[in-house]
Amino acid sequence: MKPTFLLAALFLALSATPLFLFADDSQNWAHWRGHQGNAVSLTATPPTQWSESQNVKWKVEIPGRGSGSPVIWENQVFVVSAVPVEGSGRGELSFRLFCFDRKSGDLIWDRTAAQAKPHEGTHKTNGFASASPCTDGERVYAHFGSRGLFCYDLEGKVLWEKTDFPPMTTRAGFGEGSSPTLAGNKILVPWDHEGDSVLYALDKLSGEVIWKTDRDEPTCWATPLVIESNGKSQVVMNGQNYARAYDLETGEELWRCGGQTDRPVASAVTSSGLVFVGSGFRGSFLGAFRPDGKGDIEGTESVVWTTVDDTPDIASPMMSDGRLYFHKGKTGILTCIDAKSGKVLFGPERLPGVSSTYASPIAAGGHVYLTGRSGNITVIRDAPSLEVVSTNSLGEGVDATPAPVGKELFIRGERHLFCLSE
């Protein structure tokens, strides 16, 4: 890897930090990739070894199919699924939100948000419940794409629903999958497809549109990242044409930078005053950007470094302690770089047991968890050199990003939701 450096020292005096999406949620996992969006828990200490019979606190079967990650608030675990409806005709699905007891795995409640036959197909490795839910500790939000966004209280009472989004037409019928993001009084909903693409900011209490911003982008499966930079909240989004940032309050585009590859999926992360955005389908690109620029920042001092080596496709990069971890394309090949300089710390390295990846890496308790589609999860030290700790399996495939909370690790597999604990 040969990063291109552009006045890297200048960014050290600046700061960009994740905007804490919810009040006092560091002991929970309230959003896809956690409360800061960097896929790191600073408090969790989950197990590093398990099997189908070891360190499984409980497991529960989930009907239907979905790859949305579980989210956890105190004693409640939320997960979504698209469940075939028996006797209703071919292709009819029930779009459901499940709430489980964190201690026992018992079902607390199950709500059907919608029942419909999807208007278009999906990729064979995708489904129709790929977006992760999110919660602010008072409400939980389930997003089923073209079927709508649904808001419930924590007892399962529906508070509002928004079902008037225009139907998505995704690239090659690959299906939908971007997750919503909570930030303050807003819930952000990306709507990138082959039609008119839009980023929505909705009132989280009512579902009313606060603002929407047109995006000249084709299908993108990334999830918005909200950061604070120089006193202003920004919404950072990947895109095939440009990586972009928007003013959280108004939706105004603040800056953009080209270089991305086709049909981006990976979401942005942030650390050390920088934002990192990349993609890895039919090409390779990863860039480190200072979020203080204006307009098109390509070729300016706001681009600190870029690389075109071994960058991620489906799985998003993970940021921990100033180190950026990412897989090459959809493979299990791992690279770790110093976020400030772009210098390779180790990799690309082929990991034992992990050959293909959709789930994003996570970090907790001084370890990094790397999930293969086969269900193998390799655990390494969260350190500047590679040290494999273990490789573990639960006997079924995993495409959803795991969620570490407390002393537990929650994993949504093809058929079951698992709670792991020593």
Predicted regions and their residues:
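Positively charged n-region of N-terminal signal peptides that target proteins for export
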Residues: M1-F5
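Bacterial N-terminal signal peptides
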Residues: L7-P18
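Noncatalytic, solvent-exposed loop/strand surfaces
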Residues: L21-E422
